[in-house]
Amino acid sequence: MAILVTGGAGYIGSHTVLFLLEQGEQVIVLDNLQKGHAGALSDVTFYHGDIRDDQLLDTIFTTHSIDTVIHFAANSLVGESVKQPIEYYENNVIGTHTLLKKMLEHDVKKIVFSSTAATYGEPVQIPIQESDPTIPTNPYGETKLAIEKMFHWCQEAYGLQYVCLRYFNAAGADPNGRIGEDHSPESHLIPIVLQVALGQRERVAIFGDDYQTEDGSCIRDYIHVMDLANAHYLACEHLRKDGQSGSFNLGNGKGFSVKEVIEVCRQVTGHPIPAEIAPRRSGDPASLIASSEKAQTILGWEPKYPSLETMVEHAWNWHKEHPHGYSTENKDKQ
């Protein structure tokens, strides 16, 4: 049986595909390549298309014996979602509705969903627990929460089995340097800092240094992308054993401040990396850390690469060899 990975050419998706292949899984990838990269994929059956394409989904489910879907395909920028909410509901919610409808038509009833800790909104406690209130503060988080609720009701009505994985910031790259992180425009802190080290940016901005944290900068939960890949695989195995459906946080066990991330990047790269203090961004909480006790207990998941230094080292190794990301590879493959 095969696993269909939607959005499998994206950052977390491509690392999950690589991890699945290393476990001996047969993998089918569907991606529209708006954000993903063909150069991040090898040795898989690839479909270039959209999750809202009914006919394409029929073809995929008819052609391949698929027992589980891992669903990454989504628009995922918080700021953009505030400016373009219709697009986010269209792609994320309606897209998932189309995917789910076709899954059920073809009797595929297991799905692992890449959700987000943005479903919680402003945290009521740190670390965040799955039982905490889910009150998203932006359309991106709202769409992910709506999808989670859709899965719940489809379980009640049709026997769908699902795992929703909620996490904050993926970081790092394949430890062997085969694939890495490439967004356009780049919005994630670690690759932005590494672009400064590569001379592609003059400096990095620290948005606020007057938070109630030890060094005044925001604290965030970073998880190595291969640890996230492993979590998605373990979730598939959990569902194949008829494990309970539900939502699971994935956390590193501790958070890292913006200043701490920059300092570790300086140490790893050997570059000074100039930084400047900028005004706070609206809606940025001082600290966001997720508890992963439930995932550890039920899924058997433990981070293999919890060290910030290791995440930065793996990211730096890839960025040094691919300073312009997948641009060359994409031109060759598309």
UniProtKB/Swiss-Prot annotation:
SUPFAM superfamilies: NAD(P)-binding Rossmann-fold domains (SSF51735)
Catalytic activity field: UDP-alpha-D-glucose = UDP-alpha-D-galactose
Keyword annotations: Carbohydrate metabolism, Galactose metabolism, Isomerase, NAD
Pathway: Carbohydrate metabolism; galactose metabolism
Broad enzyme group: isomerase
Entry cofactors: NAD(+)
GO molecular function: UDP-glucose 4-epimerase activity
Family: Belongs to the NAD(P)-dependent epimerase/dehydratase family.
Description of how the protein assembles with itself and partners: Homodimer.
Name by which UniProt lists this protein: UDP-glucose 4-epimerase
Primary gene name: galE
